[in-house]
Regions:
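Gram-negative bacterial Sec-dependent N-terminal signal peptides
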Residues: 1-27, 407
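Short, structured loop/turn "capping" segments at alpha-beta junctions
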Residues: 464-470, 480-484, 518-522
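Solvent-exposed, glycine/polar-rich loop segments of beta-barrel outer-membrane systems
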Residues: 150-154, 191-204, 244-258, 262, ...
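Transmembrane beta-barrel strand/turn architecture of Gram-negative outer membrane proteins
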Residues: 211-215, 397-405, 453-455, 504-514
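Outer membrane beta-barrel transmembrane domains
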Residues: 339, 404, 408, 497-604
């Protein structure tokens, strides 16, 4: 005859095996990065036309062989920013010297405009754009450089802006959802402009400003959604405080060659010029400046997603709290008034902590009144989470104060209980933006709430000695609200956020087993959990561009299907009824939520 303990041992072993499986969290925001632009984005369009002997250390308009900003962005997302053109087939179509809409023939050969670049991309992809890709359309400087008379400026700017808006519109019409449109940097700060004196500097600043206002104003008026990038302001900030960012020269060129396309380590004005100078030549950024532009772009793209960590962490804590409330009774209680209290330690770790990880101790206290298997009661609790965003992107604390109601019915074999609770959420958030050797901190203290409702039920089949087992089911619904707020330290990297609503509806089906005899009564529950709500895009707005409005990026994508294993034991401890256990989610990708809990109860 089989021991009655063997089935529960088997289920416990299965639960432990599930908990040991590796898990995954949020996927990268974009599956592809496609760039259209000029020399500011060009990652080597003309390199095949240069002498083979120098190709490894030339071909970009910077302090070669450094990366341009687009390559830094692509590297972050694990995508492609290699050149497309002159026999190359990457996703960076940008070509040095390109205007917005007019194809040219330059010193290095034919130069396709941004309009032609985008048309070639669409033609190569069946006229369709990838809705999960990031597109960048950055142009305009070469159109401005073609102005020979100030009177031409309005017409030139108007034509270029109209065509650039048309490019963005055509990409979105083809299916693109996320198009980044950087504005022009302050050309008046370049060595080329400085060579013309204060009047030339002012003139170039004025035309860049006019272009930027027309571009963003036109996109907004046309109702076209886009992701802005304020390169105009960030370049000003770098030039205004060069030592903060590791520079010692903001006025001169790092390269001795006439054009940075042939600049290489042997043609620098100093061995460290690639990192000590802001500009490579008369108009193009150095290696260090490109790195900072890439870091800036990534910060703008990722910050809205970090805000979704705040709502997700609240939902995860709410889930653990709902489980603890549901499990505080192991069966029909004695008639009368009783109390219960519990402590819990939640650990959240996502993407091996590259997304975020944190610890959240919490406490609960409740009072129940029971008669003939019916139970009603209330509870209250408090918890605090200290967490770090991954990749040194900052940290946050989250506190929750909760009140709730509980009701249940416990029969000989079946049981059902329900609860509803409301939590007041308070956050202190620090987001860090790394720009070369400098780190900016932006802080905020938003408030929020979590309305939770849960229904749990189970049934136990016959009895084999002291062994009981049967199916369980549950639904946990949560609505988390996060108030909008403005980050501190207003600058090009500071963002603002509108109110967020994050809904979660988790359905759960599984099996439970327990041993009812003896002084220690172990139990195990293993369930398949499914999240019914779809992810939402993240959104934010740049404080330095108040008239542009909010932009959207893909939201964090958490697993919709996973397993939860709960292992515990009920016993009498210090004269009190006790429930001590561990809960862990698994079968996720690079993610695990773990909770250690202990509850105690007694009669009044």
């Amino acid at each position: 005859m089989l021991s009655s303990k063997r089935p529960v041992r088997t289920l416990i072993a299965a639960a432990l095996a599930l908990a040991a499986l590796p898990a995954m969290a949020a996927d990268p925001a974009f599956n592809r990065t496609v760039f259209f632009g000029d020399s500011l984005t060009d990652s080597g369009y003309f390199r095949p036309l240069l002498p083979p002997s120098v190709q490894p250390v030339t071909g970009k308009f910077t302090t070669n062989p450094a990366w341009v900003w687009a390559e830094h962005v692509a590297d972050y997302y694990g995508t492609n920013a290699t050149p497309n053109g002159n026999g190359q087939s990457g996703d960076n179509y940008a070509a040095g010297g390109a205007t917005v809409a007019t194809d040219l023939v330059g010193a290095l050969g034919p130069t396709p405009s941004l309009k032609t670049q985008a048309a070639r991309y669409l033609a190569a992809n069946g006229g369709k754009a990838d809705g999960n890709a990031l597109y960048t359309v950055w142009g305009g400087p070469n159109d401005l450089f073609g102005i020979t008379n100030p009177a031409q400026a309005p017409a030139v700017i108007g034509a270029a802006v109209t065509n650039q808006i048309g490019i963005v519109g055509s990409l979105q019409a083809a299916g693109a959802k996320y198009v980044m449109v950087p504005n022009l940097p302050d050309i008046g700060l370049t060595p080329m402009a400085r060579a013309g004196g204060p009047a030339a500097m002012a003139q170039y600043t004025a035309v860049a400003t006019a272009y930027n206002n027309a571009l963003y104003g036109g996109l907004t008026q046309a109702g076209i959604e886009f992701i802005p990038l304020d390169t105009f302001t960030i370049l000003r900030e770098i030039v205004a405080s060069p030592t903060t960012y590791g520079f010692r020269n903001v006025t001169d060129m790092a390269c001795t060659s006439a054009s940075s396309v042939t600049c290489n380590p042997t043609s620098l004005v100093a061995p460290d010029a690639a990192t000590a100078y802001v500009f490579a030549d008369g108009v193009h950024p150095s290696a260090a400046t490109h790195q900072m532009l890439g870091q800036y772009a990534v910060s703008v793209l990722e910050a809205p997603r970090l805000q979704q960590v705040l709502t997700h962490s609240a939902q995860t804590i709410g889930h653990s709290r709902a489980d603890q409330v549901s499990l505080h009774l192991g069966g029909a209680p004695a008639d009368g008034l009783s109390w219960w209290g519990g402590v819990r330690g939640d650990m959240q770790r996502y993407d091996h902590a590259d997304l975020y990880d944190g610890l959240a101790p919490a406490g609960l206290f409740g009072i129940d009144w029971a008669r003939d298997g019916m139970v009603v009661g209330g509870f209250a609790g408090y918890g605090r989470m200290d967490a770090d965003f991954g990749n040194s992107q900052g940290d946050f604390t989250q506190s929750d104060t909760t009140v709730g109601l509980f009701a249940g019915w416990y029969g000989e074999r079946a049981w059902v209980n329900g609860q509803v609770s409301y939590s007041w959420l308070d956050y202190d958030v620090t987001r860090k933006v790394h720009l070369g050797p400098a780190t900016r901190e932006h802080k905020g203290s938003p408030e929020g709430s979590n309305l939770t409702a849960a229904l749990n039920a189970g049934y136990e089949f016959g009895q084999e000695g002291s062994f009981r087992h049967g199916p369980v089911a549950a639904v946990i619904w949560q609505k988390v609200k996060l108030d909008g707020y403005l980050e501190s330290n207003p600058s090009s990297t500071a963002l603002g956020y509108s109110d967020q609503d994050a809904d979660s509806t988790v359905g759960r089906l599984g099996w439970q087993a327990r041993l009812d005899g003896g002084s220690i009564k172990p139990y195990v529950q293993v369930t398949y959990d499914h999240e019914f709500e779809d992810r939402q895009d993240g959104s934010a707005f740049l404080q330095s561009l108040p008239g542009v409005g909010s932009y959207r990026v893909p939201g964090l994508k958490f697993d919709k299907d996973y397993a939860t294993a709960i292992l515990g034991a009920r016993m009498e401890l210090f004269g009190l009824q006790s429930n001590i256990g561990l809960s862990a989610t698994t079968m996720q990708k690079k993610a695990m939520d773990t909770s250690i809990f202990a509850s105690f109860s007694g009669a009044f």
